Design a protein with these regions (language model features):
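Substrate-binding/access-modulating region of protease and related hydrolase catalytic domains
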Residues: 37-40, 232, 236-238, 247, ...
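Hydrolase catalytic cores
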Residues: 311-314, 340-345, 369, 373, ...
Length: 683
């Protein structure tokens, strides 16, 4: 019995009840230490742990009458042939079929559809070996799992279960409730001409934070993603697709409709027919995996507008004279990145873990390069990478498929997955903490961690996610402003790591758009590293304490006492705060340095361009850049240059290097901000 029990998987947390027996511990180690994106389920020469029997805990909250089975590589061909011959009631593997008979099985079907043009990718990642077994729901799940796991050709048996919402953000606060008198005004604050004519852009402090205390307080200038200067180089590209795995996105929204991904074959096809042969019917704007239908919904009871809010941060239409801006929403010329709605929540309906895998497969097959995930398990439900691999084998397999599968014509030879860290003010939740994905924490308006944000060593990067119980005036304006449902006035404030996460997804989408513009391509691990390197320091801001209004989280029942010690968060919020301009410069292969306004900053050019002992340097600044930044400089004999800027902004300068013979001219990006970290902007 030990061998069969070791193949049974189950989970006993709030979201999905399943437990995975995972033999490939060596792959977990590689992933944990190196962030490897290879599929752990497909690696060879892993240690055999079959002798170590695992205790079966419970299957009480798993979906009755259903189990997920992964067959061995050696047996899968026979299974495929057997299932085809028997119309999905038998596999052709006698011991397994005998077990099916004992549990009164009614069907055996693949978790993902068979689609000819994508089948090679499915087989490369091993997703084709996962099957869903349905049987009499009066049969004990535990007993059925034991019987199937006893078959030698079965690698894993996993309980399936429903995925519950983990949106502990506050309810949306309509824009008009906060700024009832100036919805249609464009406040330029410092007399500057805004980049775009969207009237609410000036309230999106998370894009450009001028430290304006009439907006909200406390607030610090520069606590933003620095997207405005990035828009001078790129605003988006419609060939880049971001899959929003969330509630349904309101594809008719006035500020989103033009940037929605559209499956033209289904849009122009017949209702109820899989017109493009991709295995999904009527998937015009994505697919509703919560209800297993093509129609994306957002008007069911308990829908919150969560997915629509997330989508707006990434790609609300820019420069259209209405509403808000999206990070990669284009310039008003139908040039924003596209949003694909991967709906896993719909009112009282929710996806299962196996349908989530199907959803990730769909997003991959239909060309999405970025998977935006503001959902996940509660903090503490899973406490280690090893436990995650033990309990969510099929999900890890699907992530690897998304990351490693190439999309035709994409500047990224694979994909990137970006997750919210969670909102319990504890350890980062899973899957966000899993090394293959990017884990995003949340910052308030002043570089301090948001009251609710999860944190810890698995955190990769931080972004603005707002705060509610912290601010003294216009407290709602300290949250993130984006698109929502009509019920909430089409635009509203929300806060949470669900709101910080799409800032990173939006910047990543902007980076891929710029790569497309420049004709560059990147490998998944290379691009991920570029995203994580495109940051500004936050640890220097984490001193003393932060006070806020004590509250109790209605979703978890956890009480918060109103005091945060900032030292606790140092080195625990990720490498830094995402910077959109630095992201584009990384794509451009141009080093970027930040200088403080009216503060002389010494830069060592040799750090970027070679050994100062062998090379000489000359800085060249155009009149346009000098005037734009108020830039003056002096050069030193040791390969340094001291730069002073009197105006905030960005500019490109030239650095000419010479070794006594040939000369090479290279770019250096100068970013001038009002305030910078104590380390002079270096990371």
């Amino acid at each position: 019995m030990a061998g069969s029990e070791s193949r049974i998987v189950e989970c006993i947390n709030l979201m999905v009840m399943k437990k995975v027996y995972w033999t490939l511990v060596a792959i977990f180690v590689a992933a944990a230490l190196g962030g490897c994106v290879n599929d752990p389920t497909e690696m060879e020469n892993a240690p055999d742990m079959s002798a170590g029997s695992r205790k079966i805990l419970t299957s009480a909250e798993a979906e009755a009458g259903e189990l997920l089975v992964k067959f061995s590589k050696e047996s899968i061909a026979a299974v495929e042939a057997g299932v085809t011959r028997s119309e999905s009631t038998r596999t052709g593997i006698q011991p397994f079929d005998a077990a099916l008979k004992e549990i009164s099985a009614v069907s055996v079907e693949r978790v993902i559809p068979v689609v000819e043009q994508h089948e090679a990718d499915a087989r490369a990642s091993g997703l084709h070996r996962w099957y869903r077994v349905r049987f009499n729901d009066q049969v004990s799940l535990d007993e059925a799992a034991r019987k199937l796991a006893a078959v030698e050709d079965v690698e894993v048996v996993q309980y399936d279960g429903y995925v519950a919402r983990n949106f502990t953000e506050m309810s949306a606060v309509p824009y008009n409730n906060v700024w009832s008198s100036d919805r249609d005004q464009i406040n330029t604050r410092s007399g500057e001409t805004p980049k775009f004519n969207d009237p609410m852009l000036n309230k999106q402090w998370h894009y450009k934070n001028t430290g304006d205390e009439t907006l909200v307080s406390p607030i610090k200038e520069g606590c933003d993603i620095n997207v405005e200067p990035a828009w001078e180089f790129c605003t988006g590209d419609p060939s880049i697709i971001v899959a929003v795995m969330d509630e349904g996105v309101m594809y008719k929204h006035e500020d989103l409709a033009a940037n929605m991904w559209v499956n033209q074959a289904e849009l122009n096809g017949q209702k109820g027919v899989d017109d493009d042969g991709n295995g999904y019917v009527d998937d015009v704007y994505g697919y509703n995996f919560a209800k297993d239908q093509g129609d994306i919904t957002w008007t069911d009871p308990e829908d919150s507008g969560h997915g629509t809010h997330v989508a707006g941060t990434i790609s609300a239409v820019n420069n259209n004279g209405i509403g808000v801006c999206g990070i990669a929403g284009g310039s008003g010329n139908n040039d924003g990145v596209k949003i694909m709605s991967i709906q896993i929540f719909a009112g009282r309906y929710q996806s299962t873990i196996s349908r989530n895998v199907d959803a990730i497969y769909y997003a991959t097959s239909m060309g999405a390069s970025i998977l935006q995930c503001s959902w996940g398990l509660m903090s503490g439900a899973i406490n280690s990478d090893e436990q995650y691999l033990d309990e969510r084998s099929i999900e890890a397999n699907a992530f690897a498929h998304f990351i490693n599968t190439k999309r035709p014509g994409s500047p990224l030879n694979g994909g990137i997955i970006i997750f919210a860290a969670g909102n319990e003010a504890g350890a980062c939740g899973y899957p966000a903490a899993y090394p293959s994905v990017v884990c995003v924490t949340s910052l308030s308006t002043d570089f301090t961690p948001s009251v609710f944000t999860n944190y810890g060593m698995p955190a990769d990067i931080a972004a603005p996610g707002g705060d509610l119980y912290y601010h003294k005036n216009h407290s709602d304006a300290g949250q993130v402003l984006s698109t929502v449902l009509k019920l909430d006035g089409m635009y509203a404030y929300m806060s949470g790591t669900s709101m910080s996460c799409p800032h990173v997804s939006g910047v990543a989408a902007l980076g891929l758009s710029y790569a497309k513009q420049l004709g560059k391509t990147f490998e998944p691990d290379e691009f991920r590293d570029m995203v994580l390197a495109s940051v500004n320091d936050i640890d220097s801001h984490l001193t003393g304490t932060k006070t806020y209004i004590p509250y109790t989280d209605s979703a978890t029942g956890i009480g918060y006492d109103g005091l945060m010690k900032m030292d606790t968060y140092k080195g625990q919020m990720g490498i830094g705060m995402i910077d959109a301009f630095k992201m584009l410069m990384a794509v451009r292969s141009t080093p970027a340095v930040t200088v403080g306004q009216n503060k002389a900053t010494k830069i060592s050019l040799g750090k970027y361009y070679g050994d100062v002992a062998r090379l000489t340097y000359k800085l060249s600044v155009s009149d346009e850049v000098a005037d734009k930044l108020g830039l003056t400089y002096t050069t030193g004999e040791d390969g340094t240059v001291e730069i002073t800027c009197t105006k905030q902004g960005v500019g490109l300068v030239s650095v000419e290097t010479s070794n006594g013979g040939s000369e090479v001219s290279r770019e250096l990006a100068i970013i001038c901000r009002a305030k910078i970290a104590s380390n002079g902007g270096w990371l």
